[in-house]
């Protein structure tokens, strides 16, 4: 009887069918750039000051500048304060008394804020995300990142339950509806709620696209195909720069960025299901039809005899999260990878969310960030082949951290230098993230691989949630976030020196393979009973084609 991997080898690892699928899976990744990073351009800094009703309603014949002078104090730089106003004088006060600043006690704004009249409506302006509400800008990003975590937890099982195709269709539809609804909210609280739901859907289709590619593309091209699909996020960031530059009204920007999602209805007719998943559900005939279709598209038709021999592959049971900490070697690997994934997310998103803080034009910086991320992802594949996984991971993380540390000592009047350092950091962080996916999968043995990937991915999402909150520490000292974003990747990178190299090695199946440091034997299709006992569990071999991929 032929196993699925043998049949797919006859179909071809990366023929025309898989190329088309990779392109299709790249579209949601392309659109994800807007959903994740679009808000950065909706809350740009702009001048504002307290709206002082008593001056506006007074009968004094004063110019706008004079009204501002008697109602708003100046800061140390001589500019009007953004969050303070003079306490309103008594009704009996004369204009002379007011102009002489006899009533110069200050208070917080109590009637809202005034913004430049010639500026398009921004999210910050409409919902007054300033002064005591300014932290909501960063908090909303944490809410979105929390939605990504919840979405991974929810849609992972859904993807395994109803299939990759219907799950992806549902996630794309949910993304389009919630993102479009966000453009019409009347309160910031509703905006946050919809952004959370949008993030859960985003996490779902980012997961489903990777799973579909991994289950259709053969092993010789799988890494390149996944990287190619993920690189569309970088392309989306570049397009976002131009879109945000041309559309400054936040509601119109939201609608414009969402509209392409609604055009993906054609996925209903062209998106294939995963034959691996169909086999796992006992739907063998449907799987055979799909595999034969792919073979015909690739110009490599299969014989009916070979298809009729198609059976699910036998694998052993997977462990749970606690099993990762029972074995000394697995415990060390797991703890280091938790740190690596946490820092990967922390550094990558910190640079992306601070795109406007490096001194140069935010739109130009965003364009450059997207442009360097794409080669960063592809060059990481070359680095892994030349330097090995361990040293590639160590070097990219350390380089990203060093860039942050250097930025601390660069004067603010050298924005070009700061931006160049940030761009190098962005390149390194994108490469580090890509390497982590490959390296982590190779470090965990088969019996515990998916559980390990799921656990470290949780900490990656936690890193994303914490990132905007760390950025809030700049209100105490501007260097605090930079020190954190710089020191943690250096530390995590150095920890990678304690990990084994996996370049050129066959994936390990069992704990015995791991302990002996030998490639897994080709005759093994399932873990031995003693391996499961070493994990503190025993179980008989069962049939399982597709393991859960929650993250």
From Swiss-Prot:
Instruction: Quote the PTM field.
Output: Glycosylated.
Question: In the UniProt record, does the keyword Electron transport occur?
Answer: no
Q: What is the effect of changing residue 535 to S?
A: In strain: FVB/N
Q: Which reaction does it catalyse?
A: nicotinate(in) + a carboxylate(out) = nicotinate(out) + a carboxylate(in); orotate(out) + a carboxylate(in) = orotate(in) + a carboxylate(out)
**Residues in the Extracellular compartment per record:** 44-142, 189-195, 246-251, 354, 426-427, 474-478
GO process terms (BP): negative regulation of fatty acid metabolic process; nicotinate transport
Q: Which segments cross the bilayer?
A: 23-43, 143-163, 168-188, 196-216, 225-245, 252-272, 333-353, 355-375, 405-425, 428-448, 453-473, 479-499
Q: Report the Pfam families cross-referenced here.
A: Sugar_tr (PF00083)
Report one GO cellular component.
Answer: apical plasma membrane
Q: Which UniProt keywords apply?
A: Cell membrane, Glycoprotein, Membrane, Transmembrane, Transmembrane helix
Q: Where in the cell is it found?
A: Apical cell membrane
Tell me the outcome of changing residue 77 to T.
In strain: FVB/N
Tell me the impact of changing residue 506 to I: In strain: FVB/N
Tell me the protein family, please.
Belongs to the major facilitator (TC 2.A.1) superfamily. Organic cation transporter (TC 2.A.1.19) family.
Q: What does this protein do?
A: Anion antiporter that mediates the transport of orotate and nicotinate in exchange for organic or inorganic anions. Translocates orotate across the apical membrane of proximal tubule epithelial cells. Possibly involved in orotate renal reabsorption and nicotinate intestinal reabsorption. Orotate transport is Cl(-)-dependent.
- Name the chain's protein: Solute carrier family 22 member 13
Q: Which organism is this protein's natural source?
A: Mus musculus
Give the classification, highest ranks.
Answer: Eukaryota, Metazoa, Chordata, Craniata, Vertebrata
């Amino acid at each position: 009887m032929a196993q699925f991997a043998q049949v797919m080898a006859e179909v071809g690892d990366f023929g025309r069918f898989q190329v088309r699928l990779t392109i299709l899976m790249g579209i949601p990744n392309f659109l994800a750039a807007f959903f994740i990073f679009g808000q950065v351009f909706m809350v740009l800094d702009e001048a504002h000051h307290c709206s002082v009703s008593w001056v506006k309603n007074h009968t004094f014949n004063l110019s706008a500048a004079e009204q501002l002078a008697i109602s708003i104090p100046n800061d140390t730089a001589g500019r009007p304060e953004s969050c303070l106003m003079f306490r309103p004088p008594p009704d009996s006060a004369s204009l002379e008394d007011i102009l002489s600043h006899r009533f110069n006690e200050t208070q917080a704004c109590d009637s809202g804020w005034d913004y430049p009249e010639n500026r398009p409506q921004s999210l910050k302006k409409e919902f007054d995300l300033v002064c005591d509400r300014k932290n909501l800008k960063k908090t909303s990003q944490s809410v979105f990142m929390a939605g990504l975590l919840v979405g991974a937890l929810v849609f992972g099982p859904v993807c395994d339950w109803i299939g990759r195709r219907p799950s992806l269709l549902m996630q794309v539809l949910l993304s389009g509806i919630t993102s479009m609804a966000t453009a019409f909210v009347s309160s910031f609280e509703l905006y946050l709620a919809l952004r959370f739901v949008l993030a859960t859907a985003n996490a779902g289709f980012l997961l489903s696209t990777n799973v579909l590619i991994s289950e259709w593309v053969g092993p010789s091209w799988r890494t390149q195909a996944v990287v190619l699909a993920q690189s569309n996020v970088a392309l989306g960031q570049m397009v976002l720069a131009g879109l945000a530059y041309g559309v400054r009204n936040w509601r119109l920007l939201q609608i414009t960025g969402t509209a392409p999602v609604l055009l993906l209805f054609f996925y209903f007719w062209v998106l294939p299901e995963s034959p691996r998943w169909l086999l796992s559900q006992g739907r063998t005939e449907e799987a055979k039809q799909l595999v034969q279709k792919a073979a015909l598209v690739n110009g490599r038709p299969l014989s009916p005899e070979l298809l009729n021999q198609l059976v699910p592959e036998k694998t052993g049971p997977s462990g749970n999260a606690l099993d990762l900490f029972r074995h000394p070697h697995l415990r060390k690997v797991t703890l280091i990878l938790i740190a690596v994934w946490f820092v990967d997310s922390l550094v990558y998103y910190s640079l992306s969310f601070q795109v406007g803080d490096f001194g140069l034009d935010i739109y130009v910086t965003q364009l450059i960030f997207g442009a360097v991320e794409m080669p960063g992802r592809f060059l990481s594949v070359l680095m892994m082949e030349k330097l090995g996984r361990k040293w590639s991971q160590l070097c990219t993380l350390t380089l990203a951290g060093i860039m942050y540390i250097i930025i601390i000592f660069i004067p603010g009047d050298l924005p070009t230098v700061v931006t160049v350092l940030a761009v190098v950091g962005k390149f390194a962080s994108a490469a580090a993230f890509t390497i982590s996916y490959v390296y982590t999968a190779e470090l965990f043995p088969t019996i515990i691989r998916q559980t390990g990937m799921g656990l470290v991915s949780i900490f990656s999402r936690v890193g994303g949630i914490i990132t905007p909150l760390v950025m809030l520490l700049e209100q105490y000292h501007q260097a605090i976030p930079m020190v954190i974003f710089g020191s943690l990747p250096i530390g995590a990178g150095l920890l990678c020196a304690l990990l084994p190299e996996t370049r050129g090695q066959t994936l390990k199946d069992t704990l015995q393979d791991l302990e002996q440091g030998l490639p897994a034997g080709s005759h093994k299709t399932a873990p031995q009973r003693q391996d499961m006992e070493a994990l503190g569990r025993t179980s008989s071999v069962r049939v399982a084609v597709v393991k859960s991929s929650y993250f």
